UniProtKB/Swiss-Prot annotation:
Keywords: ATP-binding, Cytoplasm, Magnesium, Metal-binding, Nucleotide-binding, One-carbon metabolism, Potassium, Transferase
Location of this chain's protein in the cell: Cytoplasm
Reaction it catalyzes: L-methionine + ATP + H2O = S-adenosyl-L-methionine + phosphate + diphosphate
Organism from which the protein derives: Streptococcus agalactiae serotype III (strain NEM316)
Protein name as annotated: S-adenosylmethionine synthase
Co-factor binding comment: Binds 2 divalent ions per subunit. Binds 1 potassium ion per subunit.
A GO MF label: methionine adenosyltransferase activity
Length: 398
């Protein structure tokens, strides 16, 4: 009998405290980019019972009503009742945003490659906003080329939110978490779901029996394909027995604390940098999107079944200091050839990434819950597979 291989990933709903913070930060970023596409933004948010603090650094010509953006975001998530302990109408909003450090701006606005040079490539003008390493990943486990555990975990909490907002399950409240354990065979292919954990905030008047029944019938059975479920699959639904107090009333939330939820559920490595509240000159965000774009196109081109791409940058320098492609033995060509193709086809300078993926637009609030990668419900440029032919042509020419 072969040994079981299990892998687990989690997700959280848009009403989770950390995700409220992420969405507020990205809503502020979008509001600024609507007026000033060249703005530099690093907006952080902290939420807790009755209060929201927004702080960070920005350089922009835009005027944004932070108070209005915060309250609208909270209302759209669903915190619209005083009994939740955190509501759009009554929450205190405390903004504290200052101008970006001129020392940092110097390197971002004029990259090392062009300082003192008379001949300048416009795409060399923007240096990386910080040093760092970023990873992108793709695998052929799902149609969107994502690991199955995180894909299912996102879908479960998204389904809970849809049922709440549509009014089908009126007792649901905004905060929720999911966790999915998938069993893999000896060839690392997913064969079944071993366990599902769902914790969802609810009104005090619903019974546990009703909640369990609804979550299994309307969420789990609707989201997880039946061939992954069997009589050995374990369901843990609100295992504490009660989840009435939630959101910022139950736990404080902070921007950037769900970086594994935002990416690949732990299935791939992570460079450590968060995304939300940051404009695209911050390579923590833009280069992570570029790395996903590269990895997804490589798998879509049938050049590998599983790919991890690492990029790394120095602050104030446009060109990446390293590019690495790892196919985990699934590639049909040498990794050195893939790396050469990546360098030829994808412009990985910050300005090149911004142009390639059109990242000066206000598209970020929609990414701040249910994952930045593998989304099928919204059109994100780094999820497109429009470089497949270019990759195939490059490899054929070798």
């Amino acid at each position: 009998m072969s040994e079981r291989k299990l892998f687990t990933s989690e997700s959280v709903s848009e009403g989770h405290p950390d995700k409220i913070a992420d969405q507020i930060s990205d809503a502020i970023l979008d509001a600024i980019l609507e007026q000033d596409p060249d703005a530099h933004v690093a907006a952080e948010t902290a939420v807790y019972t009755g209060s929201v603090h927004v702080f960070g650094e920005i350089s922009t010509t835009a005027y944004v009503d932070i108070n209005r953006v915060v309250r609208n975001t909270i209302a759209e998530i669903g915190y619209d009742k005083a009994e939740y302990g955190f509501s759009a109408e009554s929450v205190g909003v405390h903004p504290s945003l200052v101008e970006q450090s001129p020392d940092i701006a110097q390197g971002v606005n004029e990259a090392l490659e062009v300082r003192g040079s008379l001949e300048q490539d416009p795409l060399d003008l923007i240096g990386a906003g910080d040093q760092g390493l970023m990873f992108g990943f793709a695998v052929d486990e799902t149609p969107e080329l994502m690991p199955l555990p995180i894909s299912l975990a996102h879908q479960l909490v998204k389904k809970l939110t849809d049922l709440r907002k549509s009014g089908e399950l009126t007792y649901l409240r905004p905060d929720a978490k999911s966790q999915v354990t998938v069993e893999y065979d000896e060839n690392n292919q997913p064969i079944r779901v071993d366990a599902v954990v769902i914790s969802t905030q609810h009104d005090p008047n619903v019974t546990n029996d009703q909640l369990h029944k609804d979550v299994i019938e309307k969420v789990i059975n609707e989201v997880i394909p039946s061939h992954y479920l069997d009589d050995q699959t374990k369901f843990f639904i609100n295992p504490t027995g009660r989840f009435v107090i939630g959101g910022p009333q139950g736990d404080s939330g902070l921007t950037g604390r769900k970086i594994i939820v935002d990416t690949y559920g732990g299935y791939s490595r992570h460079g450590g940098g968060a995304f939300s509240g940051k404009d695209a000159t911050k390579v923590d965000r833009s280069a992570s999107y570029a790395a996903r774009y590269i990895a997804k196109n490589i798998v879509a081109a049938d050049l590998a079944k599983k790919v991890e791409v690492q990029l790394a940058y120095a602050i104030g320098v446009a060109q990446p200091v390293s590019v690495r492609v790892d196919t985990f033995g699934t590639g049909v060509i040498a990794e050195a050839d893939l790396e050469a193709a990546v360098r030829q086809i994808f412009d990985l300078r910050p300005a090149g990434i911004i142009n390639m993926l059109d990242l000066k637009r206000p598209i970020y609030r929609q990414t701040a819950a249910y994952g930045h990668m593998g989304r099928t419900d919204i059109d994100l440029p780094w999820e497109r597979v429009d470089k497949v032919q270019a990759l195939k042509d490059f490899i054929a020419s070798k």
